Each structure stands twice: as structure tokens, then as C-alpha cells.
Regions:
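Conserved helix-loop functional segments at active or binding sites
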Residues: 185, 220-228, 324, 333, ...
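General beta-strand structural signal in soluble alpha/beta enzymes
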Residues: 162-166, 190-194, 237, 260-263, ...
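N-terminal ligand-binding/catalytic initiation module
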Residues: 1-205, 436-445
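Rossmann-like adenosine-cofactor binding region
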Residues: 266-366, 371
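Adenosine-phosphate binding glycine-rich loop
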Residues: 2-27, 222, 336-447
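Active-site nucleophile and cofactor-binding loops and adjacent substrate-binding regions
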Residues: 72, 168-169, 207-211, 236-240, ...
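Glycine-rich phosphate/diphosphate-binding loop of Rossmann-like nucleotide-binding domains
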Residues: 195-198, 203-314
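Predominant activation on well-ordered alpha-helical scaffold segments within soluble catalytic domains
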Residues: 11-12, 29, 33, 103, ...
């Protein structure tokens, strides 16, 4: 493309190349819209077709996964690994198992991951992978056979200095263990090619908690910069999985009253707030094969909003921790009308572009996922460092490093987030992540 093209011309170019990839196009639009004024002031970043290269993955691997279920029936799923950018290190990003997974979603996640990893200051590139396999309702044997079948193809594309996956939606410690075990068997190599592993074979303390903890660390820093804090605040959390659980735990430690959590079936509301005992029971219920938030609500006699998200509940802080585009304009209007002060993304792109703009116009503090939920991948980077050194750090050391990284990310967002009274964290995160990746790409030439 001509180096003088406009923002809309560039976005139309991306849309035209992949007309059916709506999630990816949305992610590119969100990033480029905030970057464009910076790019016009810094024309060197429009040279050498850098932007065109930045929105095109270095490699996309697609393959079938054939496995046998408990009824002895052959099942066929589709899987991908999007190796988006290795400009600053090996590809790094999770594997997602969910029926909704497609190439558009994985490209959007890999694109976001590239900037998120750059923000951590650790030497990690961006990638993402997954399958349309649904682990819900499957036996442990079926999940194991699927993971092992998937690795018979994926293993040849991974390596400690090439591509290091981790978990994501539908992929927890169990699934990572199955995949890492099969990788070791096929490659005859025990090098670190997965993070989020069990502690018995190279995992890191604090890794399961890291995304949720990091979200709260970042949000607390954002609140403090604007004269507030979690202490005494009413908080709602969407989701009830790994990220949500540990965000609830850390928010309680900071003095917040967490009054809502959810899953795909509905929302539980507890005006008295979660306690350690209640949270432990929720985690226990959700870890069972078919455990639902409704079961938790019934057991404790709490309000249950069937089929609803938590955004109608009046709160000071909202933490969307479920999935992409869960918080739309209508939900944003509800939150704003109820006096929400801050929204911080625990999931990847859970807020639509229109809702994000609405929050910013209303003066609501808004922390984008690429900054606020970077704690998980940051601790994955720390796990890689421990594996490379053949060491295991104490929980306190990992947690302290995580906290320090999240404060550094917050500082980078503030540095690039404008000079007004209220920091534009979307702009700050996008520019800070972009500059690191773009500088590396320019230094390495046209490759």
C-alpha cells in the first residue's frame, strides 16, 4: 500500500483481505484507531510496509484432530496455531478449546497477545491456538485422547525457543499436562514447551492465580492514580472460572465487597459479598464436571438471575472476565447509569468498541485487557525463566515479580496515555506495546 493512505483505507484493506473475520477486524480497528494520531506524528512507523506486516500473522497452521470417544466412535475436530509475531521472542500464547473457536478469533487473540506480551517487557512474541473441541461433558479419558491426538501434529511446530503455548478457555492444568506429556514423548525432549504446567513437572507457583491477581494489581494502581482504591468498593465479576476466581480473591484482600459472579447460564448476586469460605465453595462447585453458578446460588439461598449477565447490578467496579464482546452498549449504559467508576478487562476484548467509547465519554476509568490481564502471560514468562535456569522460585518471589510487572505496565500506559486529568489507558497500552514490537521489526529489516 501507498505510505500516505488514511486510517479508513488501511482498515478497508484489512477487511477486504479477510471479509469474514469480524473479530480480527474489530481488534485491528480498535488498535489502529488509537494508534493513528501517533503514527501521523511518527512517520517512520509507516515505512517498509510495517503496518501491513504487523496485521498479517507470520504463520497459520490448520489441521484436523481425529480421536475416539468413549462410545468407540471416531470424532473429527479442527485445530489451529496462529504464530503471529516473533519480533521480540518466541511465539507465546494460550490454547483455547471451545465450540466457538475459529481462525478469526484466534487471529484476534494472537494480534492482541503480541502487544500484551510486549507490555510485560519480557522477551516473548505473540501467538494463539485452539480447537472447536468442547471439553464440557467429556470424560477425562476423552479429554486425554483428544489432547494426545492434537499433539501428534502440533508438536512439530513447538519448541522452547520457537513457540510456547499455555492454557486458555477450556484448557486448564489437566489439559496442559496431557499435551506437555505427549509433547515430551513425541519429541524425546523435556525442554519447556508449555507453561501453566503442574508443580511436579516444571510449573510455577502463582501461575494459576496470575491473571486474576494481575488484573487487581493493575486496577488498584489505576484507581490510586485517580484518588481511589478497592477498599470499600462494590465489585461485580463476570465469569466464574480461573481468572474470575482469583480476581475475586485478590479484590477481597484489597478490601472490596464482591457481590456478583456469573457463568454462561446466569448470574449470582450476593449483597453481603463473597467470603473466603463462599469462594472456596464456588471453586469446588465449578471444578466439578457440570457445576454451575445456579448450584452455588441455590446452596447459599442467594439471588440468581437466570440467563443474565451481572451488568445490571449497581457496582463501583466491573471486571469482565468471561469472553469477548460480553459487555455491549446496553450493558455499558446500565453500568454508567448505576454509577460505575472503573471497568477493567480480565478477559480478552470482552468490551465492544462502542461500549469502550461510551465508558471513556462518561469519564469511567477503563483498563483494556492487553494491559490489565497481562499477569497470566507475564507469569508464564517467569515460568520459562525458572525452567531455563532449572530453578523453582518461592510463591512470594513470583508474586512480587508479578506485582512489579503490572506496575510497570501501568506506568507505560500512563506514559503514553495522554496528558489530561484522566489517563486514556486504551491509547497508552496500544502505543506502548506497538512501539516495542515496531522498533524490533524495523531493526530486523524486511523479513
Amino acid at each position: 500500500m501507498d505510505q500516505t493512505y488514511s486510517l479508513e483505507s488501511f482498515l478497508n484493506h484489512v477487511q477486504k483481505r479477510d471479509p469474514n473475520q469480524t473479530e480480527f477486524a474489530q481488534a485491528v480497528r480498535e488498535v489502529m484507531t488509537t494508534l493513528w494520531p501517533f503514527l501521523e506524528q511518527n512517520p517512520k512507523y509507516r515505512q517498509m510496509s510495517l503496518l501491513e506486516r504487523l496485521v498479517e500473522p507470520e504463520r497459520v497452521i490448520q489441521f484436523r484432530v481425529v480421536w475416539v470417544d468413549d462410545r468407540n466412535q471416531v470424532q473429527v475436530n479442527r485445530a489451529w496455531r496462529v504464530q503471529f509475531s516473533s519480533a521480540i521472542g518466541p511465539y507465546k500464547g494460550g490454547m483455547r478449546f471451545h465450540p466457538s473457536v475459529n481462525l478469526s478469533i484466534l487471529k484476534f487473540l494472537g494480534f492482541e497477545q503480541t502487544f500484551k506480551n510486549a507490555l510485560t517487557t519480557l522477551p516473548m512474541g505473540g501467538g494463539k491456538g485452539g480447537s472447536d473441541f468442547d471439553p464440557k461433558g467429556k470424560s477425562e479419558g476423552e479429554v486425554m485422547r483428544f489432547c494426545q491426538a492434537l499433539m501428534t501434529e502440533l508438536y512439530r511446530h513447538l519448541g522452547a525457543d520457537t513457540d510456547v503455548p499455555a492454557g486458555d478457555i477450556g484448557v486448564g492444568g489437566r489439559e496442559v499436562g496431557f499435551m506437555a506429556g505427549m509433547m515430551k514423548k513425541l519429541s524425546n525432549n523435556t525442554a519447556c514447551v508449555f507453561t501453566g504446567k503442574g508443580l511436579s513437572f516444571g510449573g510455577s507457583l502463582i501461575r494459576p492465580e496470575a491473571t486474576g491477581y494481575g488484573l487487581v494489581y493493575f486496577t488498584e494502581a489505576m484507581l490510586k492514580r485517580h484518588g481511589m482504591g478497592f477498599e470499600g468498593m462494590r465489585v461485580s465479576v463476570s465469569g466464574s472460572g480461573n481468572v474470575a476466581q482469583y480476581a475475586i480473591e485478590k479484590a477481597m484482600e484489597f478490601g472490596a465487597r464482591v457481590i456478583a459472579a456469573s457463568d454462561s447460564s446466569g448470574t449470582v448476586v450476593d449483597e453481603s459479598g463473597f467470603t473466603k469460605e463462599k469462594l472456596a465453595r464456588l471453586i469446588e462447585i465449578k471444578s466439578s464436571r457440570d457445576g454451575r453458578v445456579a448450584d452455588y446460588a441455590k446452596e447459599f439461598g442467594l439471588v440468581y438471575l437466570e440467563g443474565q449477565q451481572p451488568w445490571s447490578v449497581p457496582v463501583d467496579i466491573a471486571l469482565p472476565c468471561a469472553t469477548q464482546n460480553e459487555l455491549d452498549v446496553d450493558a455499558a449504559h446500565q453500568l454508567i447509569a448505576n454509577g460505575v467508576k472503573a471497568v477493567a478487562e480480565g478477559a480478552n476484548m470482552p468490551t465492544t468498541i462502542e461500549a469502550t467509547e461510551l465508558f471513556q465519554q462518561a469519564g469511567v476509568l477503563f483498563a483494556p485487557g492487553k494491559a490489565a490481564n497481562a499477569g497470566g502471560v507475564a507469569t508464564s514468562g517467569l515460568e520459562m525463566a525458572q525452567n531455563a535456569a532449572r530453578l523453582g522460585w518461592k510463591a512470594e518471589k513470583v508474586d512480587a515479580r508479578l506485582h512489579h510487572i503490572m506496575l510497570d505496565i501501568h506506568h507505560a500506559c500512563v506514559e503514553h496515555g495522554g496528558e489530561g486529568e484522566q489517563t486514556n489507558y486504551v491509547q497508552g497500552a496500544n502505543i506502548a506495546g506497538f512501539v516495542k514490537v515496531a522498533d524490533a521489526m524495523l531493526a530486523q529489516g524486511v523479513i
